[in-house]
């Protein structure tokens, strides 16, 4: 698989490409599948439809990897927190984590309840071409904790940060509990058939450097170390969004570092490129315009050259991006990097 070879810095015939949120609302096929499911959460839980949605971007765009269609919040959901998705607002937990007692009340072994995810993986792997990789994923302990403490997405993360500074032992207990679940969750994804795993630390930039390293990065390192110990042949990709200023403190046992669009690739390559393969980092809104897209691709390829790079966006696809431009991006990257 070209994608897996690239994760391990092996020679590839061209630079592989996939896109975060490549299965999404910009595709009419996705919207049809979602309509059939009835709701976003039901789409995640319906393995037949989730498989359909996972495969759509591979078939339509020609990307080199599929990423499992699911949501990072299925883990806290199965740990016992009631989750709903409010239209135009996003995810909302009906209960929140406020103290040690509420951390202790979370169910252990939630990963055993996620058979709908593992079924999606095995179905997708059966239908996916052998040359194409399937990526599994989860959210980072810190990012999941913020949703569980705030009850929803936040601009200030005030409740989470208040806990971090005034009751660090409560937050640590939650992060520890989540880490153990996530290790087993990703392990079962691997056993079900994924070829690589990715951990999304979407709210990494909410923390100052020392707090980030202690309350997020340390847990990411713990998870990736255990996964590499168990499955050395499976690439681990970490994507901590918005920590470009902390790159000099990044270390650990993983294979690929996801670079967001706000972090200059030149800096990421200089600091991390010798040790990790870099993934990224086209600004997603460049896909609105073909000239802007071409310019962005040119800049990235000039910096990264032929090896140690997986092409991706620096954040997820937006719902109204033109699908023909997404397809053009894949063709352009393949054509420009073919060797």
From Swiss-Prot:
InterPro entries: UROD/MetE-like_sf (IPR038071), Uroporphyrinogen_deCO2ase_HemE (IPR006361), Uroporphyrinogen_deCOase (IPR000257)
EC number of the protein: 4.1.1.37
Keyword set includes Transcription regulation: no
Similarity section: Belongs to the uroporphyrinogen decarboxylase family.
Phylogenetic classification of the source organism: Bacteria, Pseudomonadati, Campylobacterota, Epsilonproteobacteria, Campylobacterales
Classification via PROSITE patterns: UROD_1, UROD_2
Reactions listed under catalytic activity: uroporphyrinogen III + 4 H(+) = coproporphyrinogen III + 4 CO2
Listed pathway(s): Porphyrin-containing compound metabolism; protoporphyrin-IX biosynthesis; coproporphyrinogen-III from 5-aminolevulinate: step 4/4
GO molecular function per UniProt: uroporphyrinogen decarboxylase activity
Listed GO biological process terms: heme biosynthetic process; protoporphyrinogen IX biosynthetic process from glutamate
Residues noted as binding substrate in the record, renumbered to the chain: 21-25, 40, 71, 147, 202, 315
Keyword terms, alphabetized: Cytoplasm, Decarboxylase, Lyase, Porphyrin biosynthesis
Cellular localisation: Cytoplasm
Gene name in the database record: hemE
CDD domains on file: URO-D
Quaternary structure annotation from Swiss-Prot or TrEMBL: Homodimer.
Positions of the record's site feature: Transition state stabilizer: 71
Identification of the protein by name: Uroporphyrinogen decarboxylase
Source species, domain of life: Bacteria
Organism: Helicobacter pylori (strain ATCC 700392 / 26695) (Campylobacter pylori)
Keyword Cytoplasm carried by entry: yes
A Pfam family recorded for this sequence: URO-D
GO cellular component term of the entry, any: cytosol
